[in-house]
Amino acid sequence: MSKPFHCIYAHGFIRAAVCVPFVRVADPAYNVERTLGLARRASERQAAIALFPELGLSAYSNEDLFHQDALLDASEAAVVQLIESSRELYPLLLVGAPVRFEGKLFNCALTLYQGQLLGITPKSYLPNYREFYEKRQFTAGRLAVGRELTYAGQRVPFGTDLVYQARNIPDFALHTEICEDLWTPVPPSTYAALAGATVLANLSASNITIGKAEYRRDLCAAQSGRCIAAYLYSAAGPGESTTDLAWDGQALIYENNELLAESQRFAADEQIITADIDLERLAQDRMRLTSFNDAVGEHREQLRQFRRVEFDFRIPSDARTLLRRVERFPFVPNDPAKRDERCFEAYHIQVHGLAKRLQSTGIHKLVIGVSGGLDSTQALIVAARTMDNLGLPRQNILAYTLPGYATSAVTLNNAHGLMRALGVSAREIDIRPSCLQMFRDLDHPFARGEPVYDVTFENVQAGERTSHLFRLANHHNALVLGTGDLSELALGWSTYGVGDHMSHYNVNASVPKTLIQRLLRWIIASRQFDAQCSDILQSILDTEISPELVPSQAGTAQDKPTQSTQEVIGPYALQDFNLYYVTRHGFRPSKVAFLSHHAWGDKSRGDWPDSLPSDKHTEYDLATIKRWLGVFLFRFFQISQFKRSCVPNAPKVGSGGSLSPRGDWRAPSDAAATVWLEELRRGVPD
């Protein structure tokens, strides 16, 4: 059965809601109505989960009133009412209530779903220090003897070992813990995550003191990252007693260390926050992280004790708008501070890698071909900074611009200007005479004056450039510095062997085109070099990306590039997006297209990098996205892996940015792209 493409639940997402109700202390009848109101709002938003605070049906701050049977009876009656009134709602409701069992009182998280109480989880760790005296009223969950009880008229499992599993969404597995449980060295949710739980929910009260909100964020972020899980957190808010404490109602949703949503603190009334959690991303990361699964094996006897409580989740079919920021440029953060930090790190990783290679070889000179394009510009800048750091003169960089039959005036001028501005040893070698000799040797029609611009015509030029560079390196005892980037490597957009595919060392192989563009803008903005150099860099950024191998017309002067790389292989912005989600997360093509359409379908939606000119803001419809994704899948999986199977050494720069067979990507050179192309055809509407 085909899945509804535009529904978030068809692509491994679930929507989570975290609610902070207004409560009355010791008034469960009032509190259940407020809880129901928020639960209905969560259902209207097509949420799969609605989390509420610790002891939210009774209020947390009852202290010794918890030993009053009238309050405990009223709390159980409120649970009965909530069960009956929530039969038609979409989300699982995670609510807090005091529960009597075996002559003890437990602080519990109750999981309700469409008229059924699925299970009850008691709090494992009771704080009994400073302002907390929970052991005065409650018993720790581990002290319960039985594993089932009858509560609110239903026989249900009881314990800290419950994982709620949706039968029809394999990656949707939920565990609950309560407040202090997260503050311990080994929270119960750690074991639950190892047992397969992907969504960890914390019903918390947690009074507020100065600095505590940031500490909560740190705890939730770290636990979600360590467990490779979503972590939902709801602290008590307005209405709790302020006899000795205050409450800020902090609600948080994290996914693998990333904050997805946070409430307004100290709000006067109730709140609800929502975010969409990517369960498939969590499952992919766990599958890849061998140490996570080693930990599962280490604790397997304990993990086997967990009980699965299965349920059939009713999927909301109207959840079409993704409530999640999907950055257009996944390799380049929108946040200026993070973006600048990433550029700083990428730049210095490149410099550090090249410096080490020069030191280890004892070679103090570099040979580089400078085209006036983005990649060779970035490599030349890295080389210049490397020489500075090593205390070597920039004249040790032997930079050559090698014009051919389609070199434009603008790129040639930029190449010469950049070499002058950086103070490197610069020289121009016209490769046309040697290319013509090659055409004659090949008996190519171009040697007879015929305008035949085929792949041989292009690759003879690329090969001649690289051949010159390697022989120049031999002649001057230097290393050839490679310039090809990650995007080109993914798409196979390089001339194999004696071509731009090969070098002695490559500083760009782990840097995608969109990040190189941002790196150059950062170099300009941070004034890494002088104003003259920055002006040339800006001119290079403004120039059309082109291989410059095919002339426009014989005998016609070329002021600007006439070939457009992106007209052949697709916009680099889209292809870098595809590259990131295919290689970093292993997503199926239909999901990549869904995310791409969310990111690129409307240029007025979402944020753009502040340094990107407004005329560069663009949008793509689903048909265009599908077309170029098909190009990417075919080129990446079927026709270009042989080039990646033998690439020069290069430093890994980003977490999703290496295609080296010695690093992140090991794949056969003779695979077929059929399964990806077929999934794209079936899964994405035309």
Where are these predicted regions, by residue range?
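Enzyme catalytic cores with a strong preference for nitrogen-chemistry domains
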Residues: M1-G369, I381, R385-R394, A426
